[in-house]
Amino acid sequence: MCYLSRMSSQQMQLTISGFENRIKILEDLMNEFDSNLYIRLKRECDFKLPKEYDVSIHALTILMKRHLSNMEPIDCYQDLDTGTLQTMLIFCCTLRMIEHYEKSLSNINFFSLSNDLKRLEEYNTSCSVLLSLYQRQLKKISTTIESYYLADTLRHNQNILNLCERIYNIQKLLNKREKASVLRH
């Protein structure tokens, strides 16, 4: 990635555009996944165990490659290094997971069965861990990419802030439910 420092601003802009387009393509692909995405991800990798982080990243990569292999063309992904591809995968999966989780909130009564509440907390844990995976992966590759380039293409500061806010709002809902439950008893 050291060639980036030798690029002209026009070349840099084209490269940034290319990455943004790929991220958009990957996001669209993730959105095409069936509603059982959470179950499939859960089956292939355990989000809760820190020691499984690398295994989880590997499993996400396999999952996406399996999906991409049924589509044409796939050549545009060949020049992406593993770290960059994994980072984008984690970002897409984080977005998809949180969207799926938020949708489930509208169908659950906060005062209903304890297994519903357990499921909510499990979703929240998965979202949080995916986000930390994404941030950790960014930190890992930041040593090989110019900082301004990283900020413009991969960091997605605003997106990370939005994800944090959404996770925080979900946690607030869970806390509210817990307080209301205590008051009722």
Curated annotation (Swiss-Prot):
It comes from the Eukaryota. Keywords: Chromosome partition, Cytoplasm, Meiosis. GO terms for biological process: chromosome segregation; dynein-driven meiotic oscillatory nuclear movement. One of its GO terms (cellular component) is cytosol. The keyword Mitochondrion does not apply. It is found in: Cytoplasm. Required for correct meiotic chromosome segregation. This is Meiotically up-regulated gene 5 protein.
